[in-house]
Design a protein with these regions (language model features):
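Acidic glycine-/aspartate-rich tracts in secreted/extracellular proteins
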Residues: 63-66, 82-85, 124-129, 155-159, ...
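Polybasic, low-complexity, intrinsically disordered segments
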Residues: 20-21, 263-299
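Chymotrypsin/trypsin-fold serine protease catalytic domain
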Residues: 114-194, 226, 247, 251
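Conserved catalytic-core segment of clan PA serine endopeptidases
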Residues: 22-33, 40-43, 66, 72-128
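Positively charged n-region of N-terminal signal peptides that target proteins for export
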Residues: 1-4
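C-terminal subregion of chymotrypsin/trypsin-like serine protease catalytic domains
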Residues: 47, 52-62, 75, 168-178, ...
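Bacterial N-terminal signal peptides
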Residues: 7-14
């Protein structure tokens, strides 16, 4: 049986700046916006994660679109939220395709000074019509405290089972460090005492729950420190360190797409009812363009 994503050997962590599914993560079968992304670099299968911020726009990491030589990946496929990566492909449905990629003009993909590790993938048709998540504004970010619930999500490798990917996205807790964040921050380092991303979580969303209960994307996963066997490890401070690319500084790249006016659906043609008379016989005719039968006159 053909399946959406095949099991393959993940190579992301051979790339120095690559992030990683999770150690100590919890599987989420009903998440409405996390997306699994498979593609190829130089013919080699790769896996990343991302988040749907509109019916046709996915935010992910730039290194999930361009390799270290600046070459674009090929054969992109995108999982549908709430669907397992192992669900059979419906041959009667043509899946959305990558239409365009938006990245920062100052993106650096190679060397030691890699930067602006965020990309917005525009699809040629909706991947889903509901359930997507919005990006946190500067006001939202300024309202976060060390007590704010923050979680990372991804389809990457599962530390506990040694699986190279998770069939559904996994959720893991992260601590918010308001000291490391400023209104001009584009990259920040967050920590967790209990969990870390692993290979394949690159581009997965970091999500905060605001005081009003709404979930918003803070940014995307760009990297983890002390990576061994595909997962980050604790530093001397007993914390896992995770590098995040903040999303809001880059929203101008894709606002023109997000703000496009969606044409209203063509209204259904309205049926009209007329009354037709022939002597004492009365008939009511309902149609888009009703006409009285021969011998009848319209009342």
């Amino acid at each position: 049986m053909t399946r959406i994503f095949l099991v393959f050997v993940l190579t992301f962590l051979a790339i120095p700046w690559t992030a990683e599914a999770s150690k100590n993560g919890v599987i989420q079968t009903d998440n409405s916006y996390v997306v699994g992304i498979t593609f190829k670099y130089s013919g080699i299968d790769e896996l990343c994660s991302g988040a749907l911020i509109s019916p046709t726009v996915i935010v992910t990491a730039a290194h999930c679109v361009f390799d270290e030589n600046g070459n674009t990946g090929t054969n992109y496929q995108f999982s549908i939220p709430r669907k397992s990566l192992e669900d059979p492909i419906d041959p009667n449905i043509i899946p959305p395709k990558l239409l365009k990629v938006f990245t920062s003009p100052s993106l650096i993909t190679s060397g030691q000074k890699k930067s602006d590790d965020i990309a917005f993938i525009q699809l040629d048709k909706p991947l889903a019509t509901t359930g997507f998540i919005r990006v946190a504004t500067s006001v939202d970010l300024s309202s976060l405290t060390s007590a704010s619930p923050i979680f990372g999500y991804g389809f990457g490798a599962v530390y506990e089972t040694k699986s190279s990917y998770s069939s559904y996205p996994r959720k893991y807790p992260i601590d918010w460090n308001s000291i490391s964040f400023t209104p001009n921050s584009s990259t920040i380092e967050l920590t967790s005492r209990t969990a870390t991303p692993c290979t394949g979580d690159s581009g997965g969303p970091i999500v905060a729950t605001l005081a009003n209960g709404q979930d918003v994307i803070v940014g995307i996963i760009s990297g983890a420190s002390s990576v061994i066997n595909g997962c980050g490890n604790q530093e001397s401070d007993n914390n896992y360190h995770i590098r995040i690319t903040v999303a809001i500084p880059y929203m101008s790249l894709v606002n023109s797409v997000l703000n496009q006016v969606v044409p209203s659906p063509t209204p259904l043609a309205k049926k009209i009812t007329i009354t037709c008379i022939k002597g004492k016989i009365i008939k009511k005719i309902t149609a888009l363009n009703p006409k009285c039968p021969t011998g009848y006159r319209k009342k």
